Amino acid sequence: MHPEVSEPPVDSVAEPSLEESAGDHGDAGPGIRKEEISETKETCAGPCTTSCPSQQQPSGDNGSEGFCTHSRDDREDRGPRMTKQFLQKLCKQHKLYVTPALNDTLYLHFKGFDRIENLEEYTGLRCLWLECNGIQRIENLQAQSELRCLFLQVNLLHKIENLEPLQKLDALNLSNNYIKTIENLSCLPVLNTLQMAHNRLETVADIEHLRECLRLCVLDLSHNALSDPEILSVLESMPCLRVLNLMGNPVTKHIPNYRRTVTVRLKHLTYLDDRPVFPKDRACAEAWARGGYAAEKEERRQWESREHKKITDSLEALAMIKRRAEERKKARDRGETPLPDSEGSIPTSPEAEEKQPMGEIQKKMELFVEESFEAKDELFPETPGGEKELHVVVVNGAVENPDLSGSLAHNQTPVVVTPEESTSPVAATDGARTEDIEAVAVEIKERLFIDDLPDLEDAEGTDVSVEDQIKETDIPRIQAISSLSDDSDPELDELSLSTSEATPTGATGALSHIFAISKGPSTAATVPFTDICKPIATTDLESQGQDCGAAASRPLIQELNDEPAEEAANQPLPPQTCASDPALAHPSEDGDSDSQLPAATLLGDGAEDEAESSVHPKEPSTRVGLEDIEFGLD
């Protein structure tokens, strides 16, 4: 049928004559006429192709014989060959290993090969693609002992052979060939998939060999010429068959109720032709085999009712979860705590009570929902009105401010009443809230309770009667009220009284001036932090007054404006007289301040001016008229 296969010895013998003919043409030179070339072609075109071996002439005229042999070699070598150089070049092209044994996949499809050869070095192949070629035989695969997948579809194969070395072959594709009989496959112990679509299979005998393929699971026999319904007996004897494709065969029309029959007879089949075999389809097919179409209809109705019940139960479970969530939300809005067992009172459908596994699943779902809501309530507690949070804010404001003013109390020797003063702005800013009235009432009680503490300390520091203390504390009250207004006479009167009394009681008067600010009305302190700054400035002034003596008072600073610049320049300025000269601490009351002017007090003018400017911001306006007031008093 194929005479070319038996002619390679003749080709090897004719190679010298081919070289001679080439030499003859080489000697002929370029002067050969086109007519001669056409004549030689005509002589080799017809019967020369078939009768050239028998027409050997001993006369030495080898021209026509050489051309006939060359044309035959061209015809045989017309297609590409699977050479080692070609395979190595192909591996480089596909970025595979240059070392043949390291490659596990070789892509040789769509190359036009007519035979399998030169694969001895590729011992590590696991997948070999040879589809869409002109291969006529399965051969030269002895070195591929590790091969798992062999793809030989769309070739010119007529027989299944030479597969014994492939002991690990798992998938074999022989579709679109000219195979008429399935054979020589029992030597493949682990063959799982066999594709024989578009071949020449016709009878039961053609597929009888499949009984010996015990591990075959996927079988594709589509688009063959199988017409005998007895093929089901062969397929039924295959224990591991799961997927079967018989589409395109006449047998599908010859078997009555084809799909039901095949499903019933092949017990383990899960996929038939173009769609799966579902458990419902198998149950209906078995019911049809028992009682016909009526039994099949009843079985189908039962399956549909069970499926509908599953869907209904799922929807009811979702609705129950939603309903419980709404009930919990309503209970939280009402301020109630929902009981964890309250959900159990929700009635369930009688169908759900009949089936115990479904009831257990519902119980698990209910328990999960309850635990989820309890965890949410613990992590994110909700207050119904928010009054507790408001109360905490007010209390925190009252607690933090005493810590702020505690630094001021640490620097001062007397007991400080400023915590109540520092809390009063907080209460004023939070007046729009509901708990402000109670907070203000508590602060007022605290003020009334601590009101007498500065007087008691003054009484311990100086042996003065209670009436004198009342007088001393009353005068700074007038001063605190008038200092916030414009230039007022009570302030000037207090200044004159302080100049006339250079005794330690003046210091106590200054201390009482500190605490007298808190006894005034809360409306007088327009700026929130002025009452904190005043005691600090007054304390600095007192420390300077104690170091420099009682003589460093306001009238001395006022008399500096009356002294001429010449006398101030002539007098020396010893810094030691501030603490040594006792006469300077008691200025005369007759107004003769020029003769008793202390020069040492000039050193403390800057510090005292800064302290007075911080305590009394409007005092410079009063100093303008102090000179006239002094002369008026004289």
UniProtKB/Swiss-Prot annotation:
The record, for InterPro entries, names: Cilia_flagella_integrity (IPR050576), Leu-rich_rpt (IPR001611), LRR_dom_sf (IPR032675)
The name under which this protein is listed is: Dynein axonemal assembly factor 1
The family database entries (SMART domains) matched by this protein are listed as: LRR_SD22
Keyword presence, Zinc: no
Q: Where does it mainly reside?
A: other
Limits of the LRRCT domain: 249-288
Q: Which family does it belong to?
A: Belongs to the DNAAF1 family.
What Gene Ontology terms for biological process does this UniProt record contain? Answer: cilium assembly; cilium movement; determination of digestive tract left/right asymmetry; determination of liver left/right asymmetry; determination of pancreatic left/right asymmetry; heart looping; inner dynein arm assembly; lung development
Q: Which organism is it from?
A: Mus musculus
Q: Name one Pfam family in it.
A: LRR_9
| Gene name, Swiss-Prot/TrEMBL | Dnaaf1
| Cellular component aspect of the GO annotation | axoneme
Q: Where are the LRR repeats?
A: 101-123, 124-145, 146-167, 168-189, 190-211, 215-236
